[in-house]
From Swiss-Prot:
Protein's name in the database: 4-hydroxy-tetrahydrodipicolinate synthase
HAMAP family from the UniProt entry: DapA
Entries under PANTHER family matching the protein: 4-HYDROXY-2-OXOGLUTARATE ALDOLASE, MITOCHONDRIAL (PTHR12128:SF66), DIHYDRODIPICOLINATE SYNTHASE (PTHR12128)
Catalytic residues of the enzyme: Y133, K161
Record text on subunit structure and interactions: Homotetramer; dimer of dimers.
Highest classification ranks of the organism: Bacteria, Pseudomonadati, Pseudomonadota, Gammaproteobacteria, Chromatiales
SUPFAM superfamilies recorded: Aldolase
Name of the gene encoding the protein in the UniProt record: dapA
GO cellular component: cytosol
Main location: cytoplasm
Location of this chain's protein in the cell: Cytoplasm
Enzyme class: lyase
Amino acid sequence: MFHGSMVAMVTPMHPDGAVDEVSLARLVDYHVEHGTDAIVAVGTTGESATLDYDEHCHVMRKVVEAARGRIPVIGGTGANSTWEAIKLTRCAMEGGCDATLLVVPYYNKPTQDGLYRHFAAIADAVAIPQILYNVPGRTACDLLPDTVDRLADISNIVGIKEASTIERVHDLVERCSDRLDVFSGEDGLSREAVLAGAKGVISVTANVAPQQMHDMVAAALRGDEEEASRIDARLAALHSALFLESNPIPVKWAVSQMGLCGPSIRLPLTELSEQHHETVRQAMKLAGSL
């Protein structure tokens, strides 16, 4: 259903913290024009944790409106409350999103049975296609392959964004790829993941180098390892630099350097430390983004 380079898009904000709707629409146009294959609105990179429910729904609707059917929109609707996730997922469906991305519940650390029941309940409540998102480094909770294998039997659970190890990607592709698509959630592993059978990447780097990420993933999807490796070598420093501080701090600053939005970010996150500016800037130049 989805494939290629899918951007986990930043949410532009004014200095007072209000959502910058003009820049939001500009970003959507930019991604349409520069090869991005789908947009994730209000995921982790889109500052979902610091948007309230009404803002969350509003941004998803605005991205859909700006997309005008030119590019698929995936709404980030995960929460550590099942009922909140259902509400957000329903809002995404009613707002015109093509699918949703559901992060593993964070902080409250459910059991594997709890995770199964959480995602099954959302899938049962809202008929929209849903992509699971496993990022144990941020959630302190790991959605294990046995649980993914069970969830893959639910018809509207169509994929998983896996942000752990390349070994896990291999395992999920082997177990589940006949029923759901596997996507890399780690930019630095995306080339290897796609060559191993993943259908693409949900990418932070694509905010800054969308055409390059599209071209790299497209090469890997067609099995052109040499071309994928050549492009990825130019992106490697950027993959790393965008995580010098907590995501989305560096990428928000990087996008601002491209003139696409301002650098403002909501507390408790803060703008990128000046000591990291030059490292990010040089990585952007190497990638061809500046």
